[in-house]
């Protein structure tokens, strides 16, 4: 029987909660090898430390970290580590955490742990500090109270950004960017631009973890990624070039995809003597064939 491979077109969050069709490499151990073109220093994902540039995407994608809140498939905010929030006034937010949340090292993820993580975040991550505008954080058991320096109606949305993964600050961050989170996997080895090794979190608070070990291989070249999947060197691929898709449109492979909120856009120079004219900008916009962009440049995957 041929092993069916998984081709990840969109964010591969399915990894974190277990892939039931993952092939077992040993009778008593389920392992999974994942090829990714985006997990690299050039893409500002040099490690899995969410407080380092855009590495929060890798932290959350590979199941190491989780945020207080997250976006649903319909882009609605829903609880994750937190169970509810209250906007007390325009500067004050009270967040209540779920009971029983623990880090992978066994430490309880309570209000104090969240306070420490968020304080470290705004100290080390310029974009997060600018988004959140936190003035103070207080912790009382499983309740965290955040006061902002200015009204932040989108605070909960910002806390859902991957940079908001809650990590155990007391456990520290290794020299190669490994952190302790609350997710279903624990990172045991990381070499930037080469690989990440993950094992199941035996202390996971939110259900069973179905895969024992995951290896994420950084394969920055799309053609090389396609060859690796064809050769059976990896079980799934993320970030493959659209031109390679026809190679996998058969019964041996499955495409997994989801809609994204990501938007691609171009700026127009309002100070230019040409594009400062609204009529010119409108004409340029009308002349852009969006349908052809999707059907030709993206081969319909857009």
PLM regions with names:
Residues 19-29:
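Sec-dependent signal peptide cleavage junction
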Residues 29-40, 92-95, 114-117, 144-146, ...:
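Short, well-ordered beta-strand elements
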Residues 35-88, 180:
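N-terminal lobe/hinge region of extracytoplasmic solute-binding protein
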Residues 83-125, 274-276:
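Aromatic- and charge-enriched surface segment that lines or borders ligand/interaction sites
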Residues 86, 90, 94, 128-170:
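Surface-exposed binding/hinge segments that line
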């Amino acid at each position: 029987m041929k092993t069916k491979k998984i081709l990840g077109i969109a964010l591969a969050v399915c990894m974190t909660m277990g892939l039931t069709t993952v092939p077992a490499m040993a009778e008593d151990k389920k392992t999974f090898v994942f090829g990714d073109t985006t997990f690299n220093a050039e893409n500002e994902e040099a490690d899995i430390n969410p407080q380092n540039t855009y590495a929060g995407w890798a932290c959350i994608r590979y199941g190491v970290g989780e945020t207080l809140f997250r976006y649903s498939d319909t882009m609605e905010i829903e609880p994750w580590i937190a169970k509810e929030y209250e906007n007390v006034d325009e500067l004050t937010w009270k967040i209540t955490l779920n009971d029983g949340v623990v880090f992978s090292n066994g430490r309880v993820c309570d209000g104090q742990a969240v306070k420490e993580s968020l304080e470290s975040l705004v100290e080390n991550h310029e974009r997060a500090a600018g988004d959140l505008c936190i003035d103070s954080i207080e912790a009382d058991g499983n309740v965290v109270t955040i006061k902002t320096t200015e009204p932040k109606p989108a605070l909960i949305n910002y806390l859902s950004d991957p940079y908001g993964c809650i990590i155990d600050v007391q456990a520290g961050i290794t020299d190669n960017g490994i952190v302790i989170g609350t997710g279903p996997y624990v990172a045991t080895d990381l070499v930037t631009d080469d690989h990440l090794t993950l094992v199941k979190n035996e202390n996971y608070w939110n259900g069973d973890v179905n895969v024992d070990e995951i290896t994420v291989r950084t394969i920055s070249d799309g053609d090389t990624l396609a060859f690796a999947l064809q050769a059976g060197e990896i079980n799934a691929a993320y970030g493959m070039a659209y031109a390679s898709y026809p190679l996998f449109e058969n019964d041996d492979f499955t495409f997994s995809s989801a809609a994204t909120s990501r938007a691609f856009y171009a700026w127009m120079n309002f100070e230019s003597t040409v594009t400062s004219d609204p009529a010119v900008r409108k004409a340029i916009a009308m002349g852009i064939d969006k349908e052809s962009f999707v059907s030709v440049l993206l081969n319909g995957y857009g």
